[in-house]
Amino acid sequence: MTNKLEQLKQYSDVVADTGDIEAIARYKPLDATTNPSLLYKAAQMEQYAPLVQDALSSTDSIEAACDKIAVAIGCEILKIVPGRVSTEVDARLSFNTNASIEKAKHLIGLYEEAGISKERVLIKLASTWEGIRAAEVLEKEGINCNLTLLFSFSQAAACADAGAFLISPFVGRILDWYKANTDQKEYAPMEDPGVVSVTRIYNYYKQHGYNTVVMGASFRNTGELEALAGCDRLTISPQLLGELEADTGELKRVLTPENSGEAIAKLIEDEAAFRFSNNEDAMATEKLSQGIRGFVADQVNLENFLKSKA
């Protein structure tokens, strides 16, 4: 029997959640996703040293060098993956719609200067109200977006309503919150709060005919991945890709468009309702804030690393 990674690829598009070229080449994913944390890690790799030096020598600010490196690493990844790479807008812009739009267009411009068409890039934006509005504008201009740091059903409904190309609902970080804030410390995969969340979002999208791609993200174990087999896409770390590859057990499809469970009413919220819904969800509020702070911290780490090399 083939390994579980190959079986999973029959049901879901597998995406590599890394900037490590060697790992991407080994596991042969469709796409790859990056974020400030992964870029900071990748920029310190010996193999990327020439890209770092080129970015520093060809730009006149650390901010510009960061953008150049993000795109340069994206270009290297696109030499290997047949699909797309996700490149993230500076998380410090998470509450600024216009600045997010401008940064997204700038990143796409850098890719086009490097000979990469916008069809091979997804712009990552945090799933704040402002980020979702930025995606709505960008999608209408033909720039596809990946809405990340998504923890609530309200966020998912708003992203679909805005016409986002893809969402990245987080699984493991939801599990982390429940383990830290409730008495229950262990969950079977199908009862995992992150798995339950993504399953509901997937079913909602299929029931209402949304084309927005559901890409489960942030996994803590292979059980979560197996419980979401059939999700449109799954972005997976090299460690978990390796564990799936080493396992020759049977993997069955769980999610299908045809069997989307009980009917879920359509949810359309204006800004006030969206903000209230998410404020009522302590897990989503805390994890979104924490996620933005974490990405900002690693963006600053990347900037400081570049300053040390300048």
Swiss-Prot record:
Recorded GO CC terms: cytosol
Domain of life: Bacteria
KW Repeat (keyword) present: no
One example of a Gene Ontology biological process annotation: pentose-phosphate shunt
GO molecular function: transaldolase activity
SUPFAM superfamilies membership: Aldolase
Pfam families cross-referenced by the UniProt entry: TAL_FSA
The protein's assembly and partners: Homodimer.
Protein name: Transaldolase
Organism: Teredinibacter turnerae (strain ATCC 39867 / T7901)
Gene name of the encoded protein: tal
